[in-house]
Every structure is written in structure tokens, then in C-alpha cells.
Amino acid sequence: LGQDPRALTQDTFNRDLYPTPGRSYEGETEDYGISAEINWDFGNVTLTSITGYREYANSQGSDTDYTTVDILYRAPTENALARDFETFTQELRLTGEAFDGKLDWLIGAYYANEELQVRDNLRFGTQYGNFVACRIAIAINPALVNPGASNCLGANVAALDGTLTGSPAFGAATPAILAGINNLASISDLGTVSEVYNQTSENFAFFTHNIFAITDTLDLTLGLRYTNETKDFDATFRNDNTVCPTNRNLLGGFLGVPTLAPLAGGIISLSCQGNSTSELDGVSLEDSREEEEFTGTAILSWKPTPDLLVYGSYSRGYKAGGFNLDR
């Protein structure tokens, strides 16, 4: 839809795009970080410190429908499909030997703090209303389609409102159906003004990993880790698509009428596509979660010859949950 046919014959990774004039794919990305590892030797014991910090920010405007028809877009602002995060980590480890080298031991602690923000500003373009009104008009009767009219019907609406036939096409519901189509056709540059999602994560852990040389050929490895993680979430929404609640209130009563439900449902769905509605305007959400877990591993390995290793192992892993940073 809306693409120059020449684009279909070009190489997958080297081809021209034909976006809506005036829509931009301008974006900006910043990514940097620093890490440091320091080791101190104290005879048979080594202390290791690993510190890391990373910061990333990205936003990307787009002609989101990727066609010359202005259906969906993201303006190239700081809210355009933006991803920002800052992460700080610190790990401390002590390692050493005991019992004449029969035990290699390790104990440690870990801390991480991450702040993540996701933003978006996806909006309906200036031709969305006309485009989806034509979809409805085609579903009603392709012969009545007039793409030059804003509601894709124009004067042909007389064939539906009873002016020509004396019998309205949808009975007593006809005025509401036609009003819903007109409302749908009016969608132009509406939708998300901004969506902002924030998640802050704080994680700390204590761990140990030890290898016991039972004999010269038989080793037992035991590891244990305790992890505690807290995540705090909040989100705020700004949306100016008033057509969605208007058409839902206007046509929602017809969803229980079998002969009208498909048409009424189609108009409502296209009015609220992507859950875009002004009912979200000013809405804010908050939540939090805390988890703690023990994980570990146990491995028994036997090396009967220099070229053969036989082992059995058990391990239990864990990954903390989080929040979906979108709708």
C-alpha cells in the first residue's frame, strides 16, 4: 500500500523507501560506559573488585506505516520510541586455597542499580481517517466508494440514509452508523501525545563457589547464591484521540445486535486502534515487586584418565520478573 512498485524489485538490503513527504526517520543514540577491575593479593587470598557503569539513550522518529499514505507516524522528538537506561554494578570477590590446595574457595557479593525509561508518541497521520473510512465503505458496498470524499462516501451517502430508496440501509441505527463513519473519517493527527514508563531495579546478592579435591581424580563442586531484587514501576499517559470514546458510546449498544455488530465493531476498532483513546489522558500507574531466591549448583566429576572426564551435575537458576513497559 502506498509504495512505489519499483521498491518491490530491489535488493532486500539496498533499496529505496517511499515514505510520506515530510515524515522523518531522524533519530539519536548515545551509548557509553566505564568499568574497572582491581585485584589485591594477600598471600593465599585475593580480593577482586569489579565496578561498572553504563548509560544508553535512543530515540527514533519514523513514518511508521512505511508508505506514502500518512497513516501512522512518530515525530522525531525525545519521546519517539525512546529507550533510556542507566546501570551501576559493583562486585566484590574473595578467592583462595585451603587444606594444602585441596580446596579452592570463593565468596562474594554483588550489587546492581538500574533505571530504565521507555517513552513513545505514536500518532495517527493526517490521512488515517480517510483511509479507514474507505475500508468501512468498501465493506458496506464497493460501488459507493468515493475516495475523494473525506468519509469515502460523499454524495453516495444518499444510497444509505434513505434519500434515494426511502428505506435507510441500517434501519433506525442508520443515523448513528453514518455519524460513526464521519467521526472515524475525522481522525487526523490524533493519538499519543506521550507515554512515559519508568522502572527502577535494585539487586543485591551473596554467593560462594567451592571446589573440593576429594582425591587426585575426584572433585566435588558446590555453589550457592542468594539474590534479592526490588523493582518499582510507574507510568503516565497523554492522549488526545477523542474519537475513540465518542464512537464507543455512540455505537457500543449495537454490538449485541447480530446484523449490526460487525459494522459497529469495525468502526469502533478502527477508531481505537492500538488502544489509542483520550480516556488514557492523565492516567498514571504505579506498582512494585520484591523477590528473593536461593540458587546453586552441585557437580561431582571424576577423571579416571587424562583423556576422560565423567561427571554428574545439578543446578538451579533464577531470573527475576518485571513489568511490561508498554500497553
Predicted segment positions?
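Solvent-exposed loop segments that connect transmembrane elements
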Residues: 1-20, 63-79, 121-194, 232-288, ...
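Membrane-embedded beta-strand positions in outer-membrane beta-barrel channels/transporters
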Residues: 33-35, 89-93, 194, 203-211, ...
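Short sequence motifs at beta-strands and strand-loop junctions characteristic
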Residues: 17-18, 26-30, 82-86, 189, ...
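Membrane-embedded beta-strand positions of outer-membrane beta-barrel proteins
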Residues: 49-51, 105-109, 222, 298, ...
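Transmembrane beta-strands of outer-membrane beta-barrel pores
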Residues: 42, 53-57, 111-115, 226-232, ...
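Repeated loop/turn-to-beta-strand initiation elements of outer-membrane beta-barrel proteins
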Residues: 44-47, 102-103, 218-220, 307-310
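Outer-membrane beta-barrel domain signature, strongest for Gram-negative TonB-dependent receptors
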Residues: 1-106, 112-117
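Residue-level signature of outer-membrane beta-barrel architecture
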Residues: 39-42, 86, 96-98, 208-213, ...
